[in-house]
Amino acid sequence: RGNSIQIIYGPYVTVLKSELEDYLRTRRAKKEIKQLLKENTHSKDKMQQESIACPIKGCVIELEEVGDEAFSGGMLGEGFAVKPEEGKLYAPVDGIIAAVFRTKHALAMESKDGAEVLIHLGLDTVKRGGKGFYMKVEAGQKVKKGELICEFDLEDMRVDGYVMTTPVVISNNAEYASISLKHIGECNVGEEILTLYK
């Protein structure tokens, strides 16, 4: 089709691909996003180390503990997950919003230093069709670490039976020599959780 987009592989590949393509097609031209990401990553080659902050107040757990094989098996990348205590999501890095899923339960970011971060609010929450998710950003928007990017009805979703454990994964983990999990347990927004080494 001319311009290409990166697809995150795993059992969700069909859903993820269709949602990403749908968003990029209907909300912003693909070439605009590509240009913004290109401008955003000018310092990528110079960066040797990068940290990823906690995006939600709650309890950090290892990705292997998430009750979904796509995440626990590392199929979508390395990272961590948070059991949230409040329904507010903040940017874990300085960078650009690469994509917001049509159902608003997930988004992808690219940091100014090249990390591709996928945040998935809860498990199976795609089934809500966007209900209870209030995105504050759109694809192509620049954000600062600690900036509020989404609010969601945490208690309502729990009452409806959803597990709101939120995976945060580095989808381009193969570009790093190592990824170190620095903290497990209770965390506040902005605390360093992952360190990425080139």
Locate each region found by the language model:
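Contiguous, well-folded functional domains in the mature portion of proteins
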Residues: K38-K198
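Membrane-embedded alpha-helical signal segments
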Residues: R1-K44
